[in-house]
From Swiss-Prot:
Catalyzes the transfer of the cytidylyl group of CTP to D-ribitol 5-phosphate. The keyword Nucleotidyltransferase applies. This is Ribitol-5-phosphate cytidylyltransferase. The keyword Nucleotidyltransferase applies. GO terms for molecular function: 2-C-methyl-D-erythritol 4-phosphate cytidylyltransferase activity; D-ribitol-5-phosphate cytidylyltransferase activity. The record marks 161, 218 as: Positions ribitol 5-phosphate for the nucleophilic attack. PANTHER family: 2-C-METHYL-D-ERYTHRITOL 4-PHOSPHATE CYTIDYLYLTRANSFERASE, CHLOROPLASTIC, RIBITOL-5-PHOSPHATE CYTIDYLYLTRANSFERASE. Disulfide bonds: none annotated. GO terms for biological process: cell wall organization; isoprenoid biosynthetic process; poly(ribitol phosphate) teichoic acid biosynthetic process.
């Protein structure tokens, strides 16, 4: 089975324009989270869309699904997320297992709730690649020169930009593989390894690159929100 896991566990309101976490802010005439879920509803191979939210916001998320996506709510599961990204993925996979016991071939397409401009092509590419590789990371080629500094004051290295990519989401992998690899980490490693695909990489797994889009914006600042609103208006 193919599942989607939407990471919507953040509670930050650092934009300072609302007391709502950013995934619940309005974009156009609907919350950002709803825009994101809608993209996954369009892919018929996805059995369930599991949304991991902070426990304080579970009821609110359920109300939004009832209001904006009543025809699709049977495909959507709202569950309590974890304290960080990887524990939220773990909680999402546990919710999938509760819905239907996991098989070794079950795949989850994980995605940031605040990337509402994901395309159907990106979702389908992730699913296709995950069937032949251990994991998939969605990326775009680095446009700006990236510099490295180990002390925050002086440049220690300028890597070759031709070899660099900017990570986005989705990140896709088999549910059981993630659970096994995450379970094998020490507590210290879990603190350091906040990116799911990095866990696969350090464990020597095959992580394929899926082509992202520069329009696959992650809305984390007021400027991001302004850009997203202009993109919605153009559509």
């Amino acid at each position: 089975m193919i599942y989607a896991g939407i990471l919507a566990g953040g509670t930050g309101t650092r934009m300072g324009i609302s007391n709502l976490p950013k995934q619940f802010l309005e974009l156009g005439n609907r919350p950002i989270l709803i825009h994101t879920i809608e993209k996954f509803v369009l892919e018929p191979s996805i059995e369930k869309i599991v949304v991991g939210v902070h426990g304080d916001w579970v009821s609110h998320a359920e109300d939004l699904v009832d209001k904006y996506l009543p025809l699709y709510k049977e495909r959507i599961i709202i569950t309590k997320g974890g304290a960080d990204r990887n524990t939220s993925i773990k909680k999402i996979i546990e919710a999938i297992d509760a819905y239907r016991p996991l098989t070794p071939e079950d795949i989850v397409v994980t995605h940031d709730s605040v990337r509402p401009f994901i395309t159907l092509r990106m979702i389908q590419d992730n699913i296709q690649l995950a069937q032949n590789h251990d994991a998939v990371d969605t990326v775009v080629e680095a446009v700006d020169t990236i510099v490295e500094s180990t002390n925050g004051q002086f440049i220690t290295d300028i890597p070759n930009r031709a070899h660099l990519y900017q990570g986005q989401t989705p990140q896709t992998f088999r549910c059981k593989d993630f659970m096994d690899l995450y379970g094998s980490l020490s507590d210290e490693e879990k603190e350091i390894l906040t990116d799911a695909c990095k866990i696969f990489v350090i464990k020597g797994k095959d992580v394929a690159l899926a082509k992202g889009e520069y329009s696959n914006l992650k809305i984390t600042t007021v400027t991001d929100l302004k850009i997203a609103k202009s993109m919605i208006e153009k559509d």
